[in-house]
Every structure is written in C-alpha cells, then in structure tokens.
C-alpha cells in the first residue's frame, strides 16, 4: 500500500487487510468487507446529497448499492492537505453485466424497474429545496450540496431544436472542407436522411403527451440514475440459490442522479444495448417486457421512448464530436461510429415499426 493511500484510509474507522488498483480507483479488503477508494473529480458539493440518496434507497429496501462510508469525523468525503478529496464506497465481488448475454440484460432491465419503484422523494414533489440544503431525502434539515436549475431536465423540444441546428452547422462546415476525407463524404451522403429522422422526432414530440409526463414526473418526485449502463450494473458472486434467483445485482455510481422522466434511464440502457446488438427486435421487446412486468409502462411513457428512439442520437453525437475536434485529422473511431450509425438506420427503422408502430 502506498503511503498516500494509507493516509487517506486512516481517516476511516476500518482495518485494512490489503489493497489493489483497479480502473480509476483502489479496491480495499477490510474488516467491513470489500470497499472502493475513489478520488472525487470536479465539484464535491453533491457528495452529501448523494449520501442522502444512498441512505434513502437503503431505507426503502433497495440495499445493493455502493453507499458512501463516512470518515471518523462523520464527513462524507476525506479531504487531504494537498487538496485531494476522496470517497470510500461499499463494493461487491462480481463483474459487470455482460452485454452479450440476453438473460443478464433482462435481469438488469427488471433491476432498473425495481430501482425506479423506490427512487422518488418521500414527500411528493421534487423541489429545489430537496437538493440545496433545506430539506433532504431523509427529511433532515440542511444537508450540504446544491443542484442548479440547469440540472433539471431540459425540455426535449429545445434540445432537439438545438441539435438540429448544430447538425445544419456541421453540414455547412463539411461542405466547405477541401479536400474532403472519408468522414466528410459519408456525412454528406447520409445527412438528408438523418436530418429527416431528427425532424420526425421533433414533430412526433409536438403531438405527444411527453410534456405532461415530465410535469407529472416532477410532481411525483421521480428520479433517475442518470447513467444506467452495463458498466454500473454488477452481477454479484456469492452463495445463493441460482434456480430461485439466477442473478443478484448491485447498482453503482449514482453520481449523475437527477429529477427526470424515469424511462429516460430505460431509453439510455436499451439504446446502448440495441446499438451493440444491431437493434434486434426480439431482444428489445423482451427487455421492455422484463421492465414492464415489475413497473408497468404507461401509454405516455411508451410515447416518450418512441420519440427518444426516433432521434438519430448516435449520428448527432458523432457529428458534434467531429465538429469540436481537430478536423485536420479525423480518428478512425469517429469514422467507424458514423458508419455504424448509418448502417443501423434500417435496423432501427424496423425496431420502431415493430415495437412502437412508428413509420417514417
């Protein structure tokens, strides 16, 4: 163990048996079990709020989370003399959800539904006071930390309008590029088709009930994980009955939690999986059913999911990344992402037709 690591861990009331490095953190074998020491990057203001969320989830019976341990002084983070800030989290013996295994993806979908069932403010509406230091998740007063208004869900209408403007700006720039490379030619060839999808998403949004769904979600105090993907879903190892409980799951890394329409998490998770599986209708339908079996999906939520899937998100992200990068050298990864987005358009079209009865 390095001297600095030892100095950080000495701030906690634990006995350390051994440590080993892992991706961006340090795994610690202790008398309390497996823990993860991680440096806080960026603002630390949300850490006490995050601690409150973890406490709330556990009181609701959702216990398999990477809750934050407090220091000997009762702080949520350990602050070092050199300015470094660290959190010590509960961790689990296990591995990330395997995106190649449908059974694990279905279990992860059901796990998300269980999380959403409990991930609401206990006193009804989500108010800023719940995050800025007056009333906490557990009803206690004045926990530190603040969530700005900009952290609340931005309206999809303004988001899509902005994204479409950005796509037009990228096209204008690409047309002016000389000489053009593989990325530029591919982008221009597919632009009209992809932009049509963006316009269709905006039009579908305008006639949907998504606005009411957002208001109702805020009224009920609905929260989202914010980054529910297979990296943050751990399949736990251990002694238990595999026939009765095939997979035991821990959900980790809630740092991006916020008030939002809860199926935004489902959209994000399902989109990531579908992009890796070529938008296979059967798998997507099974994942939706696995979620809905625990937390039924309303008509408005299905509309919301449809609108989100219509928008060419991967195409926009790739174009945005290109525009913000060094355009003199386009990475092969960006070219590959663009080609994938183009190639999967027909597959996604069939997915939307069969799952949501949407026809462009």
Regions found by a protein language model. Name each.
Residues 6-29:
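ATP-binding glycine-rich phosphate-binding loop
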Residues 18, 126-133, 139-223:
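ATP-dependent phospho-/nucleotidyl transfer catalytic cores
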Residues 27, 68, 203-263:
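Active-site acidic catalytic loop and adjacent metal/ATP-binding pocket
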Residues 33-129, 136-148:
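ATP-binding pocket architecture of kinase catalytic cores
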Residues 86-99, 169-177, 269, 311-329:
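A glycine-centered beta->alpha junction motif in the catalytic cores
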Residues 263-296, 309-328:
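Active-site activation/catalytic loop segments of kinase-like enzymes and analogous catalytic loops
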Residues 316-360:
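ATP/Mg2+ or Mg2+-diphosphate-binding catalytic cores
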């Amino acid at each position: 163990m390095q001297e600095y690591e030892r100095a950080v861990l000495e701030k906690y009331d634990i006995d350390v048996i051994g440590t080993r490095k892992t991706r961006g953190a340090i795994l610690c074998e202790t008398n309390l079990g497996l823990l993860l020491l991680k440096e806080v990057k960026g603002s630390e203001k949300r850490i006490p709020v995050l601690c409150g969320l973890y406490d709330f989830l556990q009181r609701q019976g959702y216990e398999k989370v990477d809750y934050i341990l407090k220091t000997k002084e009762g702080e949520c983070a350990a602050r070092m003399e050199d300015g470094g800030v660290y959190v010590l989290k509960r961790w689990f013996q296990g591995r990330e959800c395997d995106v190649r295994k449908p059974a694990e993806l279905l279990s992860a979908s059901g796990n998300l539904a269980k999380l959403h069932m409990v991930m609401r403010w206990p006193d009804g509406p989500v108010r800023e006071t719940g995050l800025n230091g007056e009333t906490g998740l557990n009803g206690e007063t004045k926990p530190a930390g603040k969530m700005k208004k900009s952290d609340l869900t931005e309206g999809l209408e303004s988001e899509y309008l902005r994204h479409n403007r950005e796509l037009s700006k990228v096209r204008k720039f690409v047309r002016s590029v000389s000489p053009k490379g593989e990325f530029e030619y591919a982008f221009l060839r597919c632009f009209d088709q992809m932009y049509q999808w963006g316009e269709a998403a905006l039009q579908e949004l305008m006639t949907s009930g998504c606005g009411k769904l957002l208001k109702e979600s805020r009224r009920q105090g609905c929260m989202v994980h914010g980054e529910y993907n297979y990296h943050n879903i751990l399949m736990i190892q251990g002694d238990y009955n595999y026939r009765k409980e095939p997979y035991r799951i821990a959900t980790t890394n809630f740092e991006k939690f916020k008030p939002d329409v809860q199926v935004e998490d489902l959209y994000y998770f399902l989109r990531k999986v579908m992009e890796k599986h070529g938008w296979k209708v059967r798998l997507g339908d099974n994942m939706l059913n696995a979620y809905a079996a625990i937390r039924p999906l309303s008509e408005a939520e299905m509309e919301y999911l449809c609108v989100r899937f219509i928008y060419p998100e991967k195409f926009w992200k790739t174009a945005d990344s290109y525009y913000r990068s060094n355009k003199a050298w386009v990475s092969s990864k960006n070219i590959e992402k663009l080609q994938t987005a183009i190639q999967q358009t027909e597959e996604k079209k069939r997915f939307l037709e069969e799952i949501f009865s949407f026809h462009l």
